[in-house]
């Protein structure tokens, strides 16, 4: 080395950065030749030392870290606990995922940090250890995978796989770990192949954009500069930014000038700036250069090759393009080695310095409760919070920064190194943040419920998306379902029993059904007597076939039973027993059908004056369309609403039109609804005959007058039969719509009246304004009988009205007066229907508390099975507020039935250990938004379980006593805002039927058993104000009653336990798993309380999903969700793996200006605001220019920061000036706006900013334009050279356009000259081709009036301009990255 210089002796390890600094200083001191000689000596020394010893690498050198075992065990324990909390509904899926990732990432990082000290202590000369930190080959990450753990892997999309690989490569991987590992390895291989080509193409585009940028002048004469402040950035970045630049202004310390304008900045000057803390420093950059087609030496600065100002003729554009593109190519190759291992970051924690009590100012203005990112309860600090920890002998003071989470309570005892706060992650820990949507899918079928914390109104009209104002639970109440494929009817009626395993069979039935199938045979439930063993079945007891019909008729009254009706149709004071028969059996036995259809309400409860059955008289049927007409009549509702519940679903008799006359008239007409596209072959108001073709595939059935009318959904074509009468002048017709003339009211001598014996319907037709005629249409008269003979239809015993319960008959017309009736596909239309109304006398004592309950009774005798519909008068606990909470009244056995007749299986010893049968449940109707296509829901026994023992029969007395004491809590008050409450009583119970009636035993029948199904009393929805909503009667969702859990309470003291339980559990309440209900331990499943009985609680199992504010809920309240449906969507920020494979597309995205959500939106707002306000202040000529200038400056700074962020995160250093040259080109155009029309430019034409400015000055008129960001591809196709554009892309189009416009190419760039074969205007060819214009030098300075004016207006006021421009410039990467969110 040079011996004349005294060099300082250093003894420390130097890395790549230190080598760079050394070379830089050597060049400054000794020049290029000496420096290369010195570096040769360093190289020789390095190789000599490296080859002095031979290091071999064996598998035994891979030493596993000893602490790995317990670290992994601890992480697994945390993951298990997290899984439990998620299952209980304490944390939601995103919080679980986030915490799981951070637990494993922290474990992996800790192992990696342990690796180095472990090697240093146990084996400092371990070859793996020496190699991993040499920097030659391999890095700490790869060694960590060999001897630590592979940790979390990324999938090919860069997303995280949340199952970590716990093994390392030394130990070997399990099969699952190997497959996950292959994901990451494949990602590395694919990235290497694909991204290399991407990086090459990126380089090509970059070079296309800037190939014509050459250093052509020494000084462009600009007065502008960009401010850089040492306070706003780390010192390292500050030095990188300044070195090699040229000052735009003189720099003073006090009155002393330490650096002058146009002086280039070296390391010495930078150190002085840092020492004196001068700010701000104004520097020249490519952004400030006055031309877009070239650059001057002073705006570019030093050449990176020889450390002096750049030479004239240097092709700096191509150097810039290569500098940005090349690291992309190089870095893609680097991904292969780490093989897709995820590298992210975790939040920083504040730990307690010692044991002691923590104290802080618990003020609502300073801290308020919140949830951390992991779902833990915490206190959020809104500003700096001073925390004191008092130990025995010392006080520790800590300051928690704002937006941090405090994880401890005030006055809590903390241990040393306990985490007391979590600092908001968003500083330097995370590499990339992006906003991600996470959809949570339902893993079971069920019904959606939520609390009042969810907005019940959807976000938009007709949408099913609801927003959450605060953290709350969503519940999926379990139950299977069978979807009907568009079938508008259900096979099952409410409360029917069903076998869930027959769902598939039912789907096949539904798909093959048509609307014409009147009766459908279906095996509805299989009956077996539960009281006996399965082997010991009754002889000959077969499955019962229940026939369900698609229309109203559930059951048909058989007429064979009339002869022995006195025996089989018994009726006591409060009960009707009516024999029923299915239509299929009737067809088998060839019995004439009496026509009565019995109709059951949805919930099985008849209120007073409810409809029991209806009778369709065949005399009142028609097959044609038409209008019903009758004289004015009194219309009034028979039933008034009473009680609490709005019984929409219970078919009360609320006839629209109650008959008070004895006849009505039907005016027939023929109607065709045709689509708009169909061609009609007849004209409006024309006369046609029978079987005339009126459309392509349609013929008329009757002749008459044609009327064509356009409707919303098509064309209505009506054919009116009758005769046409042209009135004379004497005839005055004042009606337009039509008048009905009943028979006997016309003139006796008139010929027409003889034709129309039944009456006529006169209608005036006006085809034109002056012409009109009258149409006489025939009328059909229907006489209505006084009433049907009940004795002919029902046993006479039922019709006597001396006792309480009775039947009444009411006729009513189905269609209103003048209402049009449309036939549907040749089905007959019933005009009059006869209703049988169930009525009874009310006692004064029980004013409105009585209801009738219908239940099916199947009686099997020797060789004979009969179904009976039994209607009991019971006191309904729902209708009577006093009785609503009383379990005794909610039983379906009426009060006068003796105890020895029915034995409840809950208390019977032989049935103690039997579980509910797997294949049974009841069907219930649920709320459904879509009325046309109902869905069916089944609850099965697989989801229910029970706890605790059954109780003895003795306990019945205790129950009766405790009922009197009113121990159960008020149901309605306790439901509160919890949404739906279901009240179910004794579902699917099997009863012995023991009778002491000697007549039945000896004379006629032996009743072997009677199976009675007890039904759900009422299914209702209750909102937060306590009002009750009824389910929609038209929707048929089927619920089996068996997704239920029995929870039996401790049976030592019923009254006390009942009072205790009632304070904890209320009907409709949701219970999370592991919550305590009673003293005998925690409850094991989540669910909703369905029945509260004195000794047990029945719970319908449910799955809770926690949702936090900002989440969106899909689906409506009460909607049925299927397996795999989206329940809720979370929007959250997550860190992406810090790979250049994510970085390279990001660079490309920024350069192609595709990141809509981050840059463009912000810029558009800024452009609009600037243009609007500055134009208003300064007037037109300057407003657009300054608005566009400032916007462009802002966007340039943001783009530079964003690109630098990506490369710096990979440890790649690119000088800002290279990026600035590229960014200058993509931001140099403005878009001519359409509102300010100009004579020079076309609307939406892209022109250079300088050109727009000069043209505006020359023409002295305002040109309206705004800043516009072009991507690098579009910039390449918008240059001044069509030859360059055509050689890049779209050759034919570019050349054709250029020919049409007559474009001239001045061959100023490199590429054009290469294509033509001329001299390239750079380097040595520069001086021969380009001469400096003498004219430019001769322009006096005062001619720059435009620049002077601008400077006076805005730029000279340094404070204002700095505040606009320098806020974001060279900001810390994290801050600028937060401003422009990742797309």
Curated annotation (Swiss-Prot):
Coiled-coil region: none
One Pfam family for this entry, by name? RNA_pol_Rpb1_4
* Top class in the EC scheme: transferase
Q: List the Gene3D superfamilies hit by this protein, alphabetically.
A: 1.10.132.30, 1.10.150.390, 1.10.1790.20, RNA polymerase Rpb1, domain 3 (1.10.274.100)
What is the name attached to this protein's record? DNA-directed RNA polymerase subunit beta''
Explain the purpose of this protein.
Answer: DNA-dependent RNA polymerase catalyzes the transcription of DNA into RNA using the four ribonucleoside triphosphates as substrates.
For the biological process aspect of GO, one term held by this record is:
DNA-templated transcription
User: Which CDD domains does the entry link to?
Assistant: RNAP_beta'_C
In the UniProt record, what gene is named as encoding this protein?
rpoC2
Which family, according to the similarity comment?
Answer: Belongs to the RNA polymerase beta' chain family. RpoC2 subfamily.
Task: Name the PANTHER family for this protein.
Answer: DNA-DIRECTED RNA POLYMERASE SUBUNIT BETA
Residues holding Zn(2+): 220, 289, 296, 299
What's a single GO CC term here?
Answer: DNA-directed RNA polymerase complex
What detail does the entry give on cofactor binding? Binds 1 Zn(2+) ion per subunit.
Q: Subunit notes for this chain?
A: In plastids the minimal PEP RNA polymerase catalytic core is composed of four subunits: alpha, beta, beta', and beta''. When a (nuclear-encoded) sigma factor is associated with the core the holoenzyme is formed, which can initiate transcription.
Q: Which UniProt keywords apply?
A: Chloroplast, DNA-directed RNA polymerase, Metal-binding, Nucleotidyltransferase, Plastid, Transcription, Transferase, Zinc
The reactions it catalyses are: RNA(n) + a ribonucleoside 5'-triphosphate = RNA(n+1) + diphosphate
Q: Which organism is it from?
A: Oenothera biennis
Localization recorded for this chain is:
Plastid, Chloroplast
């Amino acid at each position: 080395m040079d011996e004349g210089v005294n060099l300082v002796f250093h003894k420390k390890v130097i890395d790549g950065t230190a080598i760079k600094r050394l070379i830089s200083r050597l060049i400054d001191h000794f020049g290029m030749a000496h420096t290369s000689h010195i570096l040769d000596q360093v190289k020789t020394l390095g190789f000599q030392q490296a080859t002095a010893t031979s290091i071999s690498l064996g598998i035994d050198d891979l030493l596993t870290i000893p602490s790995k075992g317990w670290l992994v065990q601890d992480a697994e324990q945390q993951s298990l606990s997290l899984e439990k909390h998620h299952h209980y509904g304490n944390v939601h899926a995103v919080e679980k995922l986030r915490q799981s990732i951070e637990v494993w990432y922290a474990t992996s990082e800790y192992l990696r940090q342990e690796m180095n000290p472990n090697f240093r202590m146990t084996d400092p000369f371990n070859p793996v250890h020496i190699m991993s930190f040499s920097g030659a080959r391999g890095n700490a990450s790869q060694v960590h995978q060999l001897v630590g753990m592979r940790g979390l892997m990324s999938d090919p999309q860069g997303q995280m796989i949340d199952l970590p690989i716990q093994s390392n490569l030394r130990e070997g991987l399990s099969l699952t770990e190997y497959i996950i590992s292959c994901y990451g390895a494949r990602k590395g291989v694919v990235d290497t192949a694909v991204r290399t080509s991407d990086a090459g193409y990126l380089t090509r585009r970059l070079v296309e954009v800037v190939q014509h940028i050459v250093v052509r002048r020494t000084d462009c004469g600009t007065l502008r500069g960009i401010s850089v402040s040492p306070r706003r950035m780390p010192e390292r970045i500050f030095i990188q930014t300044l070195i090699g630049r040229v000052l735009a202004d003189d720099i003073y310390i006090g009155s002393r000038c330490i650096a002058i304008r146009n002086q280039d900045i070296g390391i010495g000057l930078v150190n002085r700036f840092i020492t004196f803390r001068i700010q701000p420093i104004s520097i020249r950059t490519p952004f400030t250069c006055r031309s877009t087609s070239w650059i001057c030496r002073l705006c570019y600065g030093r050449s990176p090759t020889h450390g002096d100002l750049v030479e004239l003729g240097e092709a700096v554009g191509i150097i810039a393009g290569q500098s940005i593109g090349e690291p992309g190519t190089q870095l893609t190759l680097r991904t292969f080695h780490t093989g897709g291992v995820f590298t992210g970051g975790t939040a920083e924690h504040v730990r307690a310095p010692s044991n002691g009590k923590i104290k802080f100012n618990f003020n609502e203005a300073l801290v308020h409760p919140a949830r951390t990112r992991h779902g833990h309860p915490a206190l959020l600090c809104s500003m700096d919070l001073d925390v004191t920890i008092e130990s025995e002998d010392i006080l520790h003071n800590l300051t928690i920064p704002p937006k941090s989470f405090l994880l401890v309570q005030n006055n809590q005892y903390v241990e040393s190194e306990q985490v007391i706060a979590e600092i908001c992650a968003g500083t330097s820990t995370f590499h990339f943040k992006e906003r991600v949507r996470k959809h949570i899918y339902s893993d079971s079928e069920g019904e959606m419920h939520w609390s009042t914390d969810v907005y019940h109104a959807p976000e938009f009209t007709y949408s099913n998306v609801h927003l959450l104002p605060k953290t709350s639970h969503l519940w999926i109440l379990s139950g299977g379902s069978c979807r009907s494929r568009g079938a508008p009817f259900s096979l099952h009626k409410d409360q029917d029993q069903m076998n869930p395993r027959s769902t598939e069979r039912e789907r096949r039935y539904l798909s093959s059904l048509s609307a014409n199938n009147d009766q459908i045979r279906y095996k509805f439930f299989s009956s077996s007597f539960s009281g006996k063993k399965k082997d010991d079945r009754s002889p000959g007891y077969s499955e019962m076939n229940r026939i369900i019909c698609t229309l109203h008729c559930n059951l048909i009254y058989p007429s064979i039973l009339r002869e022995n009706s006195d025996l089989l149709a018994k009726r006591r004071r409060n009960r009707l027993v009516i024999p029923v028969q299915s239509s299929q059996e009737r067809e088998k036995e060839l019995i004439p059908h009496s026509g009565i259809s019995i109709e059951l309400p949805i919930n099985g409860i008849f209120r007073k004056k409810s409809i029991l059955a209806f009778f369709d008289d065949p005399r009142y049927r028609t097959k044609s369309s038409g209008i019903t007409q009758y004289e004015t009549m009194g219309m009034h509702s028979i039933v008034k609403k009473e009680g609490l519940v709005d019984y929409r679903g219970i078919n009360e008799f609320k006839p629209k039109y109650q008959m008070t006359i004895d006849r009505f008239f039907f005016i027939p007409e023929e109607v065709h609804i045709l689509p708009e596209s169909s061609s009609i072959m007849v004209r409006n108001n024309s006369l046609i005959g029978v079987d005339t073709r009126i459309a392509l595939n349609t013929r008329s059935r009757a002749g008459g007058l044609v009327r064509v009318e356009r409707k919303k959904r098509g064309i209505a074509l009506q054919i009116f039969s009758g005769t046409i009468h042209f009135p004379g002048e004497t005839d005055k017709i004042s009606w337009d719509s039509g008048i009905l003339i009943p028979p006997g009211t016309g003139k006796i001598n008139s010929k027409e009246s003889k034709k129309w014996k039944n009456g006529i319907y006169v209608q005036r037709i006006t085809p034109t304004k002056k012409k009109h005629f009258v149409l006489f249409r025939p009328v059909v008269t229907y006489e209505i009988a006084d009433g049907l003979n009940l004795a002919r239809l029902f046993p006479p015993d039922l019709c006597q009205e001396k006792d309480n319960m009775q039947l009444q008959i009411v006729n009513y017309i189905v269609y209103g007066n003048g209402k049009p009736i449309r036939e549907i596909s040749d089905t007959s239309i019933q005009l009059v229907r006869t209703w049988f109304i169930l009525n009874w006398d009310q006692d004064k004592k029980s004013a409105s508390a009585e209801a009738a309950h219908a239940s099916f009774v199947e009686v099997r005798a020797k060789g004979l099975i009969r179904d009976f519909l039994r209607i009991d008068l019971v006191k309904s606990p729902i209708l009577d507020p006093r009785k609503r909470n009383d379990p005794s009244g909610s039983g379906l056995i009426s009060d006068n039935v003796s105890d020895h007749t029915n034995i409840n299986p809950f208390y019977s010893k032989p049935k103690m250990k039997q579980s509910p049968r797997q294949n049974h449940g009841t069907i219930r109707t649920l709320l459904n938004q879509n009325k046309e296509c109902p869905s069916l829901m089944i609850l099965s026994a697989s989801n229910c379980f029970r706890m605790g023992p059954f109780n003895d029969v003795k306990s019945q007395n205790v129950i009766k006593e405790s009922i009197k004491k009113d121990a159960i809590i008020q149901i309605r008050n306790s439901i509160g805002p919890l949404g739906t409450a279901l009240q179910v009583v004794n579902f699917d119970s099997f009863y012995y039927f023991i009778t002491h009636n000697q007549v039945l035993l000896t004379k006629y029948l032996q009743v072997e058993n009677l199976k009675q199904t007890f039904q759900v009393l009422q299914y209702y929805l209750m909102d937060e104000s306590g009002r009750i909503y009824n389910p929609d009667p038209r929707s048929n969702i089927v619920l089996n009653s068996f997704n239920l859990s029995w929870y039996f309470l401790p049976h030592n003291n019923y009254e006390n336990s009942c009072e205790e339980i009632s304070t904890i559990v209320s009907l409709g309440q949701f219970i999370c798993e592991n919550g305590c209900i009673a003293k005998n331990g925690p409850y094991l499943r989540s669910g909703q309380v369905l029945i509260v009985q004195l000794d047990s609680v029945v719970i319908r199992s449910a799955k809770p999903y926690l949702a936090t504010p900002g989440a969106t809920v899909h689906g409506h309240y009460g909607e049925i969700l299927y397996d795999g449906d989206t329940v809720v969507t979370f929007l959250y920020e997550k860190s992406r793996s810090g790979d250049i494979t994510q970085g390279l597309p990001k660079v490309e995205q920024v350069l192609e200006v595709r990141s809509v959500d981050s840059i463009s939106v912000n810029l558009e707002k800024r452009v609009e605001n600037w243009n609007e306000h500055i134009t208003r202040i300064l007037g037109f000529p300057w407003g657009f220019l300054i608005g566009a200038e400032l916007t462009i400056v802002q966007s340039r700074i943001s783009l530079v920061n964003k690109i630098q962020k990506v490369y710096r995160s990979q440890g790649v250093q690119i000088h800002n000036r290279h990026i600035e040259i590229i960014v200058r080109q993509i931001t140099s155009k403005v878009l001519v706006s359409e509102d300010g029309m100009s004579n020079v430019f076309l609307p939406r034409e892209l022109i250079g900013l300088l050109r727009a400015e000069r043209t505006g000055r020359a023409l002295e008129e305002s040109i309206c334009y705004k800043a516009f960001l072009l991507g690098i591809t579009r910039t390449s196709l918008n240059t001044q050279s069509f030859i360059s554009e055509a050689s890049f892309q779209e050759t034919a189009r570019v050349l054709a356009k250029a020919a049409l416009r007559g474009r001239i190419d001045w061959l100023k760039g490199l590429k054009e000259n290469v294509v033509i074969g001329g001299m390239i205007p750079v380097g040595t060819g520069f001086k021969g081709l380009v001469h400096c214009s003498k004219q430019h030098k001769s322009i006096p300075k005062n001619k720059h009036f435009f620049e002077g004016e601008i400077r006076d207006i805005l730029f000279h006021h340094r404070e204002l301009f700095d505040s606009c421009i320098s806020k974001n410039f060279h900001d810390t990467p994290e801050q600028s990255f937060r401003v422009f969110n990742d797309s």
